[in-house]
Design a protein with these regions (language model features):
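Bacterial N-terminal signal peptides
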Residues: 31-40
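Sec/Tat signal peptide C-region and signal peptidase I cleavage site
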Residues: 41-45
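Beta-strand-rich, non-transmembrane domain signature
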Residues: 46-307, 311, 369, 384-390, ...
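Short, well-structured beta-strand/strand-turn elements
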Residues: 193, 358-364, 396-409, 613-619
């Protein structure tokens, strides 16, 4: 007697646990399916009163061992105050950001908040696009034997790193931080980019007791000030007199004085099912519409994306890198790539030559180094390698273009008021015919055409071309498909023996290869899969795991022991189920569920029951759809 179970899984769903109960000669199959959704409302705990003074933490702050509003918090931002003002220097405006932060470390993981990073701009090609970070001070306060021990950060703990031709990163570490430490730090960022006000976030991955953003804008600068996020802030706006000294003249005007305050703000935690958690943090966004200085200047700053297109095409460090020589022309000629008729195959073969000669350094960038330096080092960012790939493809007659974007972990691109600052990387799009394009990025180690890392699968990316520029939704490009077939038999002792045949396509194949590559060796990988599936593997074979192709296949001969008694055998037919536990473990979830790409898992199971046994009972299976049909779970016996 055989029973077959069809398990179809589109995207992800709740955990399904099931057992089949077999009994000798007198009963039927018993199938139990348990799906539990628990929604709880958290009660609001009493929280402490914020201390807005810096330099002398209170006894309550020093002795604090947990945060009442979030008992699981590893740390809490006790106070974060940012003042943004305009000043005049050398006859021109600049923006000054004064930032002060106080954090309490509650658990070992919270010590990571002693490591601070401050991004800023220092454009090597434009002296008018420069920022400077100064006035950095940081202190750790610890309570030891009822005495406050104060440890100041020294200058040798401050570092700077150049990310590309525009962007810098300042990093520092607060010393002597441990569980119980109160961290304080402050810095000043001075920016010549007076027409751009940085976004301000009231929340982050730990709860915030108090956050304040104070912004004063002279009447000459017409900004649209927008508040976004899930936790509303208290806002006030007043007019205030301002005075600026320009040479020997005293320039008087009025200003818009904004104040935003947030209290007892919850943590916004990132996870595998949200693109970019900061998109849902409470934040203030300022978009410049125009500048009006009476009798001197009027400038409209309502730029659109066509302006960005033109800038990139004419920029010698971006558009100027196209139509260059192919450094691997001889190797591609030897490989016969130019003679390949199928364009997609030609793109794949070209990419293989690139990856055989250049190694990705693990960094995503927008601007590239010189090709000479990249070729000499044999390594580079995805941008470095993508510039080379564009020229390689052009050399074999494939039309290819850069597709610029902001990665998922940096947030979505703004719909209006764009700037180059919004962009942080690009991929390559290659036309295989007049209407179809394939996508690839040099960071891809284990995939194929149209298989991109999830951070690059954005819904708004822009094709940059002299012919035309347009938007493309890369979420529609990727997919993940897994098909499993289990054929086995159960003996009277409850031992299942059989084979599992699996096919992994597109992003699923890339993940298979990545897991395999990261394992110490094939034996280690095999042991990991055995533990993951709860089986003993007798024989294991794979195909396509080391190839540049869209599919990986494997075959496993296995045994698995089921729970049994003298006259019963309990069987879970989902031997290769993709989920072992509920990924949504939080009591309360305020963020949406966002999947990186469409996913499908299909498992078909055929099991023969032992001779002399019959099915005790069986249920009718289950089918669950979300209201928009974007997720479907189906179990049929």
């Amino acid at each position: 007697m055989k029973k077959q179970g069809l398990y179809q899984f589109a995207c992800y769903d709740e955990l399904l646990k099931s057992r089949i109960k077999l009994i000798t000669n007198r009963r039927c199959l018993l199938f139990t399916s348990i799906m539990i959704l628990v929604f709880c409302m958290s009660t609001r705990a009493q929280t402490m009163k914020p201390n807005l003074k810096f330099g002398s933490p209170t006894t309550d702050e020093l002795k604090m061992s947990s945060y009442p509003a979030d008992a699981n918090a590893s740390a809490v931002t006790l106070c974060k105050i940012t003042d943004v003002d305009y000043e005049v220097m050398s006859g021109d405006f600049k923006i000054v950001y004064d930032v002060r932060v106080k954090i309490k470390v509650l658990k070992s993981d919270g010590k990571d908040y002693a490591n601070v990073e401050v991004p800023y701009i220092n454009d090597l090609t434009d002296i008018n696009a420069r920022e400077n970070v100064n006035g950095i001070k940081a202190t750790a306060y610890n309570l030891e034997n009822d005495k406050v021990v104060k440890t100041n950060m020294t200058k040798d703990m401050i570092f700077t790193e150049r990310l590309d031709k525009q962007n810098m990163l300042l990093k520092f570490t607060v010393p002597q931080v441990k569980v119980g430490t109160v961290i304080e730090y402050k810095y000043r960022l001075e920016s010549s980019l007076y027409y751009t006000i940085n976004d301000w976030y009231a929340q982050n991955s730990i709860p915030t007791l108090y956050a304040e953003y104070h912004l004063v804008v002279p009447e000459y600068f017409k900004f649209s000030i927008e508040e976004t996020g899930m936790s509303p802030l208290k806002k006030t706006m007043n007019m205030t007199p301002l005075s600026f000294f320009v040479g020997s003249d005293d320039l008087k005007c009025t200003g818009n004085d904004y104040d935003f305050i947030g209290t007892e703000l919850p943590a916004v935690k990132d996870d595998d099912f949200v693109w970019y958690a900061k998109d849902y943090c409470s934040r203030i966004v300022a978009e410049l519409r125009r500048i009006e200085i009476p009798g001197q200047l009027y400038h409209n700053y309502t730029a659109d994306w066509t302006d960005i297109d033109k800038t990139l095409i004419t920029d010698k460090e971006f558009g100027g890198r196209f139509h260059k020589s192919n450094p691997y022309k001889d190797k591609m000629t030897t490989a016969g790539i130019g003679k390949i008729d199928n364009t997609a195959d030609k793109v794949a073969a070209t990419y293989k030559i690139l990856k055989e000669n250049l190694r990705w350094d693990g960094k995503y960038r927008f601007w590239g180094q010189s090709m000479k330096d990249v070729l000499k080092a044999g390594t580079g960012s995805n941008a470095d390698l993508n510039f080379v790939l564009l020229n390689m493809l052009e050399d074999v007659g494939v039309k290819a273009v850069p597709i610029v974007m902001r990665t998922r972990d940096a947030g979505r691109l703004p719909l209006t008021h764009p700037t180059l600052k919004c962009l942080n990387t690009f991929i390559v799009g290659a036309y295989v015919n007049d209407t179809t394009m394939v996508y690839i990025d040099s960071s891809v180690e284990d995939g194929f055409l149209n298989v991109l890392p999830s951070k690059l699968l954005v819904d708004r990316a822009r094709i940059i071309s002299k012919d035309y520029c347009s938007w493309v939704n890369l979420r529609n490009v990727a997919s993940s498909k897994v098909s499993m077939f289990v054929d086995g038999k159960i003996d009277a002792s409850g031992l299942i023996s059989g084979t599992i045949s699996g096919s992994y396509r597109d992003n699923a194949a890339a993940k298979f290869r990545s897991d395999y590559r990261q394992a110490k060796d094939s034996i280690t990988y095999c042991n990991q899969k055995a533990e993951e599936l709860g089986i003993d593997i007798l024989k294991w074979q794979t195909s396509g795991v080391k190839e540049f192709s869209p599919v990986v296949a494997n075959s496993i001969s296995f045994t698995k022991k089921c729970e049994s008694s003298p006259d019963h055998v309990y069987v879970n037919p989902l031997i290769a189920a993709p989920i072992k536990e509920n990924p949504f473990s939080y009591v309360e979830r305020n963020l949406p569920v966002e999947f990186p790409y469409p996913q499908m898992f299909n498992e078909t199971v055929s099991l023969s029951i032992p001779e002399g046994y019959v099915v005790e009972s069986i249920n009718n299976g289950v089918k669950i759809n979300t209201p928009d049909n974007s997720i479907m779970f189906k179990y049929v016996i």
